[in-house]
UniProtKB/Swiss-Prot annotation:
One of its GO terms (cellular component) is chloroplast thylakoid membrane. It holds the Pfam family Ycf4. Coiled coil: none annotated. It comes from Aegilops tauschii (Tausch's goatgrass). It is found in: Plastid, Chloroplast thylakoid membrane. Keywords: Chloroplast, Membrane, Photosynthesis, Plastid, Thylakoid, Transmembrane, Transmembrane helix. This is Photosystem I assembly protein Ycf4. Seems to be required for the assembly of the photosystem I complex. GO terms for biological process: photosynthesis. The keyword Coiled coil does not apply. It is a multi-pass membrane protein. HAMAP family: Ycf4. PANTHER family: PHOTOSYSTEM I ASSEMBLY PROTEIN YCF4 (PTHR33288:SF4), PTHR33288.
Length: 185
C-alpha cells in the first residue's frame, strides 16, 4: 500500500503476514501432527486416529523416523507461526520532501534490535540503484545509496514478483520524487 502527496511519500510493506506463510504454516502443522500421531501409535501398538492405520508400522525404525519428522515439522511450523505473530519484516518507508527527512522502519525478530529505525536527510541520498540478475533465480532489488551509510535495500530480497518494467517504473518514480539519479548494476 502506498500513499503519496506532493511532499510526502509513504510506502507500507507486508512482512511475514502473507497468505502463503499462513498456508504453509497450517499445512506443515497438520502434516507434522499426522507424522507424530503415527509414530506414537506405532509405539503404543494401537490407533490413536482411526484414519491413520499404524498397527502395521513397527516402532523401530519406521515409528522413530515418523516421530522425528513430526517433531521437526512442529518446530518448523512453530517458527513460521512466530514470524507471523511477530510480523517480522513488516515496515514502512517515509520520504518527506517538505522537511527533507527520510525515515525507514523495519520490524525484526525479538531481541535488542527488534525495531530498526533509520532517519537521515534527503540531501544525503546519492542515488537510487536497481540490481537486476536474470537467470534461474532472478533478482530485482531496489536500493538507496546514502552518503556515509552505504546502500539500503528498499524492496525485499525475496520479492520475485517485480517484472523489470515494474521495478524500473518504481525506481523512476522514486528518483523523480527524491530528485536523485538512477544507477543500474
Amino acid at each position: 500500500m502506498n500513499w503519496r502527496s506532493e511532499h510526502i511519500w509513504v510506502e507500507l510493506l507486508k512482512g511475514s503476514r502473507k497468505r502463503g506463510n499462513f498456508f504453509w504454516a497450517c499445512i506443515l502443522f497438520l502434516g507434522s501432527l499426522g507424522f507424530l500421531s503415527v509414530g506414537i501409535s506405532s509405539y503404543l501398538g494401537k490407533n490413536i486416529i482411526s484414519i491413520l492405520p499404524s498397527q502395521e508400522i513397527l516402532f523401530f525404525p519406521q515409528g522413530v523416523v515418523m516421530s522425528f519428522y513430526g517433531i521437526a515439522g512442529l518446530f518448523i511450523s512453530s517458527y513460521l507461526c512466530c514470524t507471523i505473530l511477530w510480523n517480522v519484516g513488516s515496515d514502512y518507508d517515509r520520504f518527506d520532501r517538505k522537511e527533507g527527512i527520510v525515515c525507514i522502519f523495519r520490524w525484526e525478530f525479538p531481541g535488542i534490535k527488534r525495531r530498526v529505525f533509520l532517519r537521515f536527510l534527503m540531501r544525503d541520498i546519492q542515488s537510487i540503484r536497481i540490481q537486476v540478475k536474470e537467470g534461474l533465480y532472478p533478482r530485482r532489488i531496489l536500493y538507496m545509496e546514502i552518503r556515509g551509510q552505504g546502500i539500503i535495500p528498499l524492496t525485499r530480497t525475496d520479492d520475485q514478483f517485480f517484472t523489470p518494467r515494474e521495478i524500473e517504473q518504481k525506481a523512476a518514480e522514486l528518483a523523480y520524487f527524491l530528485r536523485v539519479p538512477i544507477e543500474v548494476f
